[in-house]
């Protein structure tokens, strides 16, 4: 009987250790350059998510157990009717509790959300238009958060915090606004409301993948200084863009707010081959001696349609990890990546 118990414990303890480390252990410094891989889910229109989309996200989790989700969850799921709300919430919590996922925040300027937060709803400008002048979006979806004042942004962030607290979603650490729109006012406000990480810097070029409409380029806050080769960086008080120096915007832990560039853009913009090539570009950066990161991103409502694409890319990354080839590649959440970036060398 005793040998049987020992054998059983030998099987259970490693699993317990893995789960404990995913959820509790602080990141450890890496001796050599690493390519970090983040996998972000964007909840844009949670009411439109289908059972098939949810199954696709569950399959990506199951087929790629090393992968770590950063769910950019959307509190609008609680301000208007969302058929799969309970199932979606259960999924993000389960991946957090059992697969080391992170639950962050993604905000689009929908009327129901703004009304609930006590913010006046506006319909202009739109980031999906040919020009800014005269542009509008009556749903608010394409209206950039940067259209609103710091005080109004603060109300939205506080309302989000209350929803997350009530639903057991925890204190969010990573933030990304709809269409990645960003400004210094926004970065200062997310830092003041407990966020440590921004996942918004977006490549404007078409070297790999498509690009947004002309009005987005005028309104988003990003320019050609952000590329598919961009690496995570501390956010300066002088600019949201890379390449600027201290003083930095500090989070409430008195450490700098860090930006995680969206190197692989988002699902509909890029092919599987695009993402693989960008991954290989970052392998080359690490071989030259610099730790770097890529970000893969998928919308909740197109998860089923994009499953094969991301399964293929994640399998490609998994194969590199399993091969033991250098440089080392590690999956990580965006907030944990920020902690790694700030570790002393």
Segments (PLM) and residue ranges:
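Active-site beta->alpha N-cap acidic-glycine motif
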Residues: 30-102, 166, 171-173, 320
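Metal-dependent polysaccharide deacetylase catalytic core of the NodB/CE4 family, i.e.
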Residues: 73-183, 203-210, 264, 295-300
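Well-ordered, non-membrane alpha-helical segments in soluble/globular domains
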Residues: 49-58, 83-91, 153-158, 273-283, ...
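Structural recognition of the beta-strand scaffold that forms the well-ordered cores
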Residues: 37-40, 69-72, 103-105, 173-176, ...
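C-terminal domain-boundary segment and adjacent tail
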Residues: 32, 98, 197, 202, ...
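Bacterial N-terminal signal peptides that target proteins for export
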Residues: 1-14
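Bacterial N-terminal signal peptides
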Residues: 11-23
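Active-site-adjacent pocket scaffolds in enzyme catalytic domains
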Residues: 174-290
């Amino acid at each position: 009987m005793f040998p049987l118990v020992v054998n059983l414990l030998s099987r259970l303890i490693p699993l317990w250790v893995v789960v404990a480390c995913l959820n509790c252990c602080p990141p450890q410094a890496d001796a050599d350059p690493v390519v970090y891989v983040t996998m972000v889910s964007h909840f844009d229109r949670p009411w439109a998510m289908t059972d098939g989309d949810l199954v696709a996200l569950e399959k990506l989790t199951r087929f790629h157990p090393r992968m770590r989700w950063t769910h950019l969850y959307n509190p609008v799921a609680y301000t208007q009717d969302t058929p799969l709300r309970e199932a979606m919430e259960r999924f993000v919590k389960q991946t957090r509790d059992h697969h080391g996922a992170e639950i962050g925040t993604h905000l689009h300027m929908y009327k129901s959300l703004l009304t609930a937060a006590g913010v006046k709803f506006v319909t202009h400008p739109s980031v999906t238009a040919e020009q800014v002048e005269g542009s509008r979006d009556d749903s608010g979806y394409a209206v950039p958060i940067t259209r609103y004042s710091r005080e109004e942004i603060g109300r939205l962030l506080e309302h989000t915090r209350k929803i997350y607290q009530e639903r057991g979603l925890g204190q969010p650490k990573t933030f990304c606004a709809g269409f990645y729109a960003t400004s210094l006012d926004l970065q200062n406000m997310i830092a003041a409301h407990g966020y440590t990480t921004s996942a918004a810097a977006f490549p404007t070029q078409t070297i790999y993948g498509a690009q947004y409409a002309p009005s987005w380029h005028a309104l988003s806050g990003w320019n050609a200084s952000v590329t598919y080769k961009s690496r995570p960086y501390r956010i300066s008080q002088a600019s949201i863009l890379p390449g600027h120096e201290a003083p930095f915007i500090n989070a409430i832990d008195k450490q700098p707010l860090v930006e995680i560039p969206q190197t692989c853009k988002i699902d509909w913009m890029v092919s599987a081959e695009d993402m693989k090539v960008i991954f290989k570009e970052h392998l080359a950066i690490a071989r030259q001696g610099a730790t770097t990161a890529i970000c893969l991103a998928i919308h909740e409502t197109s998860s089923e349609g994009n499953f094969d694409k991301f399964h293929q890319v994640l399998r490609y990354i998994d194969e590199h990890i399993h091969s033991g080839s250098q440089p080392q590649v590690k999956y990580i959440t965006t907030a944990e990546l920020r902690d790694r970036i700030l570790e002393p060398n």
